[in-house]
C-alpha cells in the first residue's frame, strides 16, 4: 500500500494535481473527471487526454492488448472507440467526451501493461480535440467517482 501511495503522489506531482482521499484501494486523482464506465479525462483548453482508471485496471488484471483508434477518428461521449484485453476479460473503452482523435499512445502497442503500472501517466490512451467542452460537466469529480466505486464494490 505504501508503494501505491508513493506512486500516486509522484503521478499527482507530475500532473500538477492532488490525490483524493478515499476508503477503497484504487488511486483517484483530483482535477480529473470520471465516467461511470471507469474512464478518466484531463481537460486542457480544447484538448483532452484520457484513459482507464486505476480502479478499472485493477479489476481487469494484467492488460495484454489495447485496441487504439486511428488519428482523425471521431469519438462520441459514452460510445466505444476501442478495447482493453486482459488476462481476465476484454472490455470496451468508452469515450468520456466527444471529439476528434489527435494522438494515440503508440507505446501501448508494445507495452500494454503501462495501463496497469501507470494508468494516469504513461498509460493514457488517446488525446482528442474537443467538439463540446460542456460535456465534461456531465462527468463525476474525484469525490463522486470515489463514492461511486465504493458503492459499486459493495455490491460485489
Swiss-Prot record:
Organism superkingdom: Eukaryota
Transit peptide: 1-23
PROSITE patterns the record matches: BIOTINYL_LIPOYL (PS50968), LIPOYL (PS00189)
Cofactor annotation: (R)-lipoate
Domain Lipoyl-binding: from-to ranges: 47-129
Gene3D superfamilies noted in UniProt: 2.40.50.100
One Pfam entry name: GCV_H
Cofactor note: Binds 1 lipoyl cofactor covalently.
Disulfide bonds: none
Modification sites for Phosphoserine: 131
Cellular component, GO, one term: mitochondrion
Role description: The glycine decarboxylase (GDC) or glycine cleavage system catalyzes the degradation of glycine. The H protein shuttles the methylamine group of glycine from the P protein to the T protein.
Similarity annotation: Belongs to the GcvH family.
Protein name in the entry: Glycine cleavage system H protein 2, mitochondrial
Amino acid at each position: 500500500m505504501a508503494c501505491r501511495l508513493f506512486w500516486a503522489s509522484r503521478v499527482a506531482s507530475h500532473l500538477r494535481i492532488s490525490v483524493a482521499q478515499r476508503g477503497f484501494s484504487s488511486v483517484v486523482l483530483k482535477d480529473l473527471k470520471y465516467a461511470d464506465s471507469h474512464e478518466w479525462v484531463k481537460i486542457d483548453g480544447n484538448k483532452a487526454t484520457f484513459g482507464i482508471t486505476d480502479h478499472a485496471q485493477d479489476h481487469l488484471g494484467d492488460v495484454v492488448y489495447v485496441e487504439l483508434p486511428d488519428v482523425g477518428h471521431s469519438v462520441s461521449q459514452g460510445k466505444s472507440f476501442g478495447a482493453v484485453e486482459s488476462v481476465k476479460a476484454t472490455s470496451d473503452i468508452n469515450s468520456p467526451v466527444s471529439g476528434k482523435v489527435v494522438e494515440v499512445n503508440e507505446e501501448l502497442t508494445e507495452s500494454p501493461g503501462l495501463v496497469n503500472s501507470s494508468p494516469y501517466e504513461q498509460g493514457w490512451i488517446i488525446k482528442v480535440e474537443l467538439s463540446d467542452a460542456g460535456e465534461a460537466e456531465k462527468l463525476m469529480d474525484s469525490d463522486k467517482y470515489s463514492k461511486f466505486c465504493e458503492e459499486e464494490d459493495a455490491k460485489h
